[in-house]
UniProtKB/Swiss-Prot annotation:
<keyword id="KW-0325">Glycoprotein</keyword>
<feature type="transmembrane region" description="Helical; Name=2">
    <location>
        <begin position="58"/>
        <end position="79"/>
    </location>
</feature>
<feature type="transmembrane region" description="Helical; Name=5">
    <location>
        <begin position="196"/>
        <end position="219"/>
    </location>
</feature>
<feature type="transmembrane region" description="Helical; Name=1">
    <location>
        <begin position="26"/>
        <end position="49"/>
    </location>
</feature>
<feature type="transmembrane region" description="Helical; Name=4">
    <location>
        <begin position="140"/>
        <end position="158"/>
    </location>
</feature>
<feature type="glycosylation site" description="N-linked (GlcNAc...) asparagine">
    <location>
        <position position="5"/>
    </location>
</feature>
<dbReference type="InterPro" id="IPR017452">
    <property type="entry name" value="GPCR_Rhodpsn_7TM"/>
</dbReference>
<dbReference type="Pfam" id="PF13853">
    <property type="entry name" value="7tm_4"/>
</dbReference>
<protein>
    <recommendedName>
        <fullName>Olfactory receptor 2M4</fullName>
    </recommendedName>
</protein>
<feature type="topological domain" description="Extracellular">
    <location>
        <begin position="1"/>
        <end position="25"/>
    </location>
</feature>
<dbReference type="GO" id="GO:0007608">
    <property type="term" value="P:sensory perception of smell"/>
</dbReference>
<feature type="topological domain" description="Extracellular">
    <location>
        <begin position="260"/>
        <end position="272"/>
    </location>
</feature>
<dbReference type="GO" id="GO:0004930">
    <property type="term" value="F:G protein-coupled receptor activity"/>
</dbReference>
<feature type="transmembrane region" description="Helical; Name=6">
    <location>
        <begin position="237"/>
        <end position="259"/>
    </location>
</feature>
<comment type="similarity">
    <text>Belongs to the G-protein coupled receptor 1 family.</text>
</comment>
<keyword id="KW-1133">Transmembrane helix</keyword>
<feature type="topological domain" description="Cytoplasmic">
    <location>
        <begin position="220"/>
        <end position="236"/>
    </location>
</feature>
Length: 311
């Protein structure tokens, strides 16, 4: 079969997002700094939640999974881009491209479902506080997390199988800084309309369904917050929920703009900018949004630093 040979023989060229002009060199240095900061933030968040017993709650367990997904996402896309820019070697095999696509799509899907689970967690905590330990028991929490990872991986497998089944007979230059499906489709000489319809279905499942759960959850949360008698309780609930909604808005807004548009509306430069937003900036911003506005995380961090005599 054609694709079996291409898996090992096809070599693509990732054109990247930067050239070597002074302005682009500065921007590359900025991205490198953001990458380093995102690595440090997300690793710290995962370790902090694992180490500190006061953070061993469903909300923080889910937050640790979000940080782990962000960590894996940024490590899927950026190291190759950084290596290509520094070495000048922009080639990538179809197998390497497929690996990027699988992890990228899987992590995007898993994060979509996880954000919906996090919204449900806030709904239970605020609307049914007395039943929280029952409705969000450890077994259910782990089950929903595993389901998020599994559904994301299934989506990655479906997309990967389709991408490897295509034959590529036009220019093998990918106008992107990583192997994104939208950038790879124009290079195929195989009819892709059926796959594009499948991609729309996957986007509906991964984006529209979780967003519906989030909107429904927060409509109940907003109603409950408005009727809270204590100003302090209202402020704490609003702070926690606004952090989550900020992450949801950043992530889903960029993802929907990227994948829910008609193919005719896509342009390489625009796609690269939007992809950079949720594969580079969002993994860096998420830990900041949660940690800077969360006193429990801040206190836990201070406690860990004091234990190690760093402050």
């Amino acid at each position: 079969m054609v694709w079996e040979n291409q898996t090992f023989n096809s070599i693509f060229i990732l054109l990247g997002i930067f050239n070597h002009s002074p302005t682009h060199t500065f921007l590359f240095s900025l991205v490198l700094g953001i990458f380093s900061l995102a690595l440090m933030e997300n690793i710290s968040m995962v370790l902090l939640i694992y180490i500190e017993k006061q953070l061993h709650t469903p909300m923080y367990f889910l937050l640790s999974q979000l940080s782990l997904m962000d960590l894996m996402l940024i490590c899927t896309t950026l190291p190759k881009m950084i290596f290509s820019y520094l070495s000048g070697k922009k080639s990538i095999s179809l197998a390497g491209c497929g690996t990027q696509i699988f992890f990228y799509v899987s992590l995007l899907g898993a994060e979509c479902f996880l954000l919906a689970v996090m919204a449900y967690d806030r709904y239970v905590a605020i609307c049914h506080p007395l039943q929280y330990t029952i409705l969000m028991n450890p077994k259910l929490c782990v089950f929903m997390t595993v389901a998020s990872w599994t559904l994301g991986s299934l989506d990655g497998i479906i997309v990967l199988a389709a991408v490897l089944s295509f034959s590529y007979c036009s220019s093998l230059e990918i106008h992107h800084f990583f192997c994104d499906v939208a950038a790879l489709l124009p290079l195929s000489c195989t009819e892709t309309s059926a796959f594009e319809r499948l991609l729309v279905i996957c986007c509906v499942v991964m984006l529209i369904f979780p967003v519906s759960v989030i909107i429904l959850s927060y409509s109940h949360v907003l109603r409950a917050v408005i009727h809270m008698g204590s100003g302090e309780s209202r402020r704490k609930a609003f702070t926690t929920c606004s952090s989550h909604l900020s992450v949801v808005g950043l992530y889903y807004g960029a993802a929907m703009f990227m994948y829910m548009r008609p193919a005719s509306k896509h342009t390489p430069d625009q796609d690269k900018m939007v992809s950079a937003f949720y594969t580079i900036l969002t993994p860096m911003l998420n830990p900041l949004i949660y940690s800077l506005r969360n006193k429990e995380v801040f206190r836990a961090l201070q406690k860990v630093l004091k234990k190690r005599k760093l402050i």
